[in-house]
Amino acid sequence: IAAANLLLNVEGGNGKLGVVGFCYGGAIANFLATRLPSVAPAAPFYGSAPATEDVANIKAELLVVLAENVERVNASWPPYEAALKAAGVRYTLLQPPGTQHGFNNDTTPRYDQAAAAQAWQQTIELFNRTLRSAG
């Protein structure tokens, strides 16, 4: 949280912050979205969901990226989604068919080039739309 607050005030910044994380980092992206109202977008990739009672604190728009075949992480999605809906949080779920945990990591046999490209494109679009200043 301290690092995020430091980045918010960096010279030349626009006062907006986006977070992206993979695996454990995805869980951290979810966590930061519940703790920092200054987070504009968050893109957690196959990260564990935050506590449902904290979801109402989310002000960010989310791109939740899940692999199709990850039982533990995916089991937390239905209650997370219900909490997102109840809180009115704007989110998109991307769960490419046939993917495994870590599908975005090109150093593993689980890498899925098409799914990784789709997920990254949607992440960039979200960040451009929510972080760039008008003008």
Describe the predicted segments one by one.
Residues N74-A83:
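Short alpha-helix in the alpha/beta-hydrolase fold that links the catalytic acid
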